[in-house]
């Protein structure tokens, strides 16, 4: 019976697919762009995903085996302007109308990007096939020549101010002998190296101070690279050169509005920039992150400006956000068994409860279900509270000053009264969380989970007995222990543009700690075991 229903469902889906037109709404002479295909003729290992973003016109996305049902919905409208047609256009997705004028710019984009990747003299040929108002564009790519770096000459300012720091960093230089020459590699090295120098006091040094020139004529297929750091930028001349020097922090100002009622010590402790310290860009960024984690602030700005030939001033500007508020929510529901329900919820928050940036959250929830003309009913009540401190409590701050600190205490209670059982659930946790660069961590030295069951209906218990994990949640529990999570990612962007990797490790430990309280717990004379209740 089940297999027959599956066959019917597949048949209906196929019928809908076949009868669905994705070009019905197109005008005469128009076609829908269905696909962009990239084929690299001379290197099957080359990832076409590197150049796909540089094609200017993209086809509609697909969901099911290359089919987009929203295209069909849109095309139900045809050329009509009826109410149904307008609804179809609003709910559906319009087809991408093929535009042949976008092909030539796409070819130019691909060639330029291949040159950026180190393929010089690449060719791209585009061809279009159109059948029944459906167009497919194929880009045949022949990768150009690559040059191997056979040697590198470093040229630093004659003053020698960069020599010591540059030599200390040579092991981390990305451009090495034997690699393929590419603008992308040189640009990445410019960013990396300039960031390194700005960590070591060189406030004015940027990636635009880096110049590269390559000799590709002396040895066929190879390039001799000159790696130069100049005291003027790429859009300047030698007349604009300003000698590099190390800078130090001078005056530090923390500015915030009068309505920000917070202890000044809290703001000072979050600041990692101190007068007399050598300029370090990472310290500035870390200070910004620490202030941004403070929920009481709506905006944070850390401005660093040169004050004289060897010092900079830092101005930290803070803006206050809404301090407190509450939310009331009521939902009504019904189900096929005739049960009616109402679920009220009330939440309250305060972002500065003790005038130190502490965030208090309180939540009250309820769920009441009943059946008209019947005694069947259920009641669920819940309350939860949490407070978050913008620091590590009971932990030496200096040991973790590089991290964005947070300490959170949470507790909750949930009461459930149903015809099958009465259940009480209590949870509590005390823990630390923070982040440093690409690493995020959370550690709970203590966490508690208590489940207490009363008036269990044995018939109900038998119906769920086949599911071990579900059954375990309907027995008494008292779990007390510790736990934590470590998360590392290679990309911290909100919207990553490339693939990335991450590592996540979780651990929980519970049980043995309770044995410390055995002398205080009642003992069963028959079994010799201690019990909590």
What spans do the regions from the language model cover?
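Transmembrane beta-barrel architecture of outer membranes
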Residues: 224, 268, 286, 311-313, ...
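Predominantly transmembrane beta-strands of Gram-negative outer membrane beta-barrel pores used
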Residues: 327-334, 340-394, 408-413
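Secondary-structure transition/capping motifs at alpha-helix termini
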Residues: 293-298, 318-324, 350-358, 394-395, ...
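Beta-strand secondary-structure signal
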Residues: 111, 136-140, 224-228, 313-317, ...
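C-terminal motif of bacterial Sec signal peptides marking the signal peptidase cleavage site
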Residues: 16-19
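Periplasmic polypeptide-binding modules associated with outer-membrane biogenesis and secretion
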Residues: 21-334, 365-370
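Transmembrane beta-strand segments of outer-membrane beta-barrel domains in Gram-negative
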Residues: 199, 323-325, 375-533
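Bacterial N-terminal signal peptides that target proteins for export
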Residues: 1-6
């Amino acid at each position: 019976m089940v297999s027959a229903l599956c066959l019917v469902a597949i048949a209906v889906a196929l019928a809908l697919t076949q009868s669905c037109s994705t070009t019905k709404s197109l005008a005469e002479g128009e076609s829908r762009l269905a696909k962009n295909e990239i084929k690299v003729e001379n290197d099957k290992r080359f990832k076409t995903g590197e150049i796909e973003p540089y094609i200017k016109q993209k086809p509609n996305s697909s969901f099911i085996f290359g089919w987009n049902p929203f295209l069909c919905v849109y095309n139900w409208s045809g050329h009509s302007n009826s109410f149904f047609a307008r609804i179809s256009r609003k709910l559906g997705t319009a087809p991408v109308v093929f535009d042949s004028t976008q092909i030539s710019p796409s070819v130019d984009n691909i060639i330029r990007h291949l040159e950026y990747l180190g393929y010089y003299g690449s060719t791209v040929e585009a061809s279009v096939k159109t059948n029944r108002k459906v167009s497919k564009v194929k880009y045949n790519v022949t990768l150009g020549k690559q040059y191997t770096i056979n040697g590198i000459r470093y040229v630093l300012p004659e003053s020698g101010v960069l020599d010591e720091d540059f030599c200390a960093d040579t092991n981390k230089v990305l451009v090495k002998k034997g690699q393929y020459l590419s603008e992308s590699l040189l640009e990445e090295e410019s960013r990396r190296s300039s960031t390194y120098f700005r960590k070591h006091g060189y406030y004015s040094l940027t990636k635009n101070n880096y110049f590269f020139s390559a000799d590709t004529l002396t040895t066929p297929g190879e390039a001799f690279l000159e790696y130069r750091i100049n005291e003027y930028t790429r859009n300047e001349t030698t007349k604009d050169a300003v000698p590099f020097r190390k800078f130090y922090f001078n005056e530090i100002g923390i500015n915030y509005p009068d309505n920000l009622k917070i202890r000044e010590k809290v703001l000072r402790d979050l600041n990692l920039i101190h007068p007399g310290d050598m300029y370090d860009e990472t310290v500035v960024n870390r200070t910004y992150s620490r202030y941004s984690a403070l929920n009481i602030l709506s905006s944070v700005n850390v401005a660093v400006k040169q004050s004289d030939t060897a010092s900079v001033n830092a101005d930290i500007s803070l803006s206050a956000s809404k301090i407190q508020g509450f939310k009331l929510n009521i939902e009504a529901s019904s189900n096929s068994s005739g049960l009616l329900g109402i679920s009220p919820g009330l939440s309250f928050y305060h972002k500065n409860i003790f005038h130190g940036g502490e965030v208090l959250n309180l939540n009250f929830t309820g769920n009441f279900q009943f059946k008209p003309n019947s005694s069947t009913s259920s009641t669920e009540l819940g309350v939860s509270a949490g407070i978050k401190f913008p620091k590590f409590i009971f932990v030496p701050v200096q040991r973790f000053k590089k991290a964005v600190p947070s300490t959170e205490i949470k507790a909750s209670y949930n009461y459930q009264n149903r015809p099958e059982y009465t259940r009480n659930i209590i949870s509590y946790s005390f823990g630390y969380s923070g982040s440093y660069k690409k690493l995020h961590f959370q550690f709970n030295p203590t966490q508690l989970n208590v489940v207490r069951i009363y008036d269990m209906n044995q018939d109900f218990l038998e119906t769920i007995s086949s599911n071990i994990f579900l059954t375990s949640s309907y027995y008494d529990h008292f779990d007390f222990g510790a736990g934590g999570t470590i998360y590392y990612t290679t990309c911290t962007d909100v919207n990553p543009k490339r693939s990335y990797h991450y590592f996540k490790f979780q651990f929980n430990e519970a049980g043995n700690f309770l044995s410390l309280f055995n002398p205080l717990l009642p003992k069963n004379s028959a079994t010799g075991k201690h019990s909590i209740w």
